[in-house]
Amino acid sequence: MAYVKKERKRIKKCKLCRDNVEYIDYKDVRKLKEFMNDKGKILPKRINGNCAKHQRMVRTAIQRARKMMLVPYVNE
């Protein structure tokens, strides 16, 4: 019987940890759009590769930007 090597999934590294980001500004709309899909929903961390700490920071920044009407709420 032939030996079949299992493929390992590549672990995504957090881009924000690599760049030593300590704060995500809610006024930086271009940066926030990277973590949202085309309908305006926040992408989960398993898709965008954020760690838990930075995913919370992204979530609060997007929520603040939505309240200030800088980023639209979810579009249908």
UniProtKB/Swiss-Prot annotation:
The keyword Ribonucleoprotein applies. It comes from the Bacteria. GO terms for cellular component: cytosolic small ribosomal subunit. Keywords: Ribonucleoprotein, Ribosomal protein, RNA-binding, rRNA-binding. PROSITE patterns: RIBOSOMAL_S18. It holds the Pfam family Ribosomal_S18. GO terms for molecular function: small ribosomal subunit rRNA binding; structural constituent of ribosome. GO terms for biological process: translation. The keyword Ribonucleoprotein applies. HAMAP family: Ribosomal_bS18. Belongs to the bacterial ribosomal protein bS18 family. Binds as a heterodimer with protein bS6 to the central domain of the 16S rRNA, where it helps stabilize the platform of the 30S subunit. Part of the 30S ribosomal subunit. Forms a tight heterodimer with protein bS6. This is Small ribosomal subunit protein bS18. It comes from Petrotoga mobilis (strain DSM 10674 / SJ95). The gene is rpsR.
